[in-house]
């Protein structure tokens, strides 16, 4: 069995004189076979999938769309800043016909409380770098410069930082002087120290005190609305000029009008009053008639 193992040996004809012809024929047969295989291979189709829920990942979406056919490539677009899903992606199927069927069936399909939007992308409009590094798992972007700047520094590191700021400040002032610009600005190191002091002073206790003081100030500023101004009898009396008297009369008239409007008056009909007068007069007339009869 060991003799049959190993790489395949080159094909040789039985007649050594016709070896060259035999090799040419074999090459032609192989070319025809490859061409037939290429013709039989279906052209791939790409579809756009929109309104995807943010909780879905690449593996889940690919597994879902693989029920229509073999998915060769898939790309879910993500934000470069946060790494979160943008809500749309691209799916490439092995066959173009399968891609069209998947786009038709999944368009306006209720998926995770959302209507999916799917449409077929023609091969002319598919970008060459659409599926670049599609097999690589997405990593959230890290910002090392921001982390370095916000890290907690020791005293030595802070002193080095101050020296760097001073050098930059000197260079800036020299450049401005060369260009003939008279501009004075505060040193950057002092500004940094002020910011650090403010950050240290604003603690949880200080912030609570500030909030309590602000609340007290607001309560003092908001005065209760008095409906009428109280007149102080012991205060100084105003000068009685004719203009002042006219103003006072107009104010009193307005007050009376307001009081009249507030009062509710019920008016009784006139017929009822007449009936009451007749009823009250009837007993007196009947007594007079009785007296006359008695005298007769």
UniProtKB/Swiss-Prot annotation:
One of its GO terms (cellular component) is chromosome. The modification Omega-N-methylarginine is found at residue 114. PROSITE patterns: RRM. One of its GO terms (molecular function) is RNA binding. It is found in: Nucleus, Nucleolus; Chromosome. There is a cross-link at residues 139, 179, 274 (Glycyl lysine isopeptide (Lys-Gly) (interchain with G-Cter in SUMO2)). Its main location: nucleus. Residues 207-219, 286-296 have a biased composition (Basic residues). The modification Omega-N-methylated arginine is found at residue 248. The modification N-acetylalanine is found at residue 2. Residues 45-123 form the RRM domain. There is a cross-link at residue 274 (Glycyl lysine isopeptide (Lys-Gly) (interchain with G-Cter in SUMO1)). Phosphorylated. InterPro entries: NIFK_FHA_Ki67-binding, Nucleotide-bd_a/b_plait_sf, RBD_domain_sf, RRM_dom. Keywords: Acetylation, Chromosome, Isopeptide bond, Methylation, Nucleus, Phosphoprotein, RNA-binding, Ubl conjugation. The modification Phosphoserine is found at residues 221, 233, 250. Residues 18-28, 245-257 have a biased composition (Basic and acidic residues). Residues 229-272 are annotated as: Interaction with MKI67. Residues 1-45, 196-296 are annotated as: Disordered. The modification Phosphothreonine is found at residues 226, 237, 241. The keyword RNA-binding applies. Binds to the FHA domain of MKI67; this interaction is enhanced in mitosis. This is MKI67 FHA domain-interacting nucleolar phosphoprotein. The gene is NIFK.
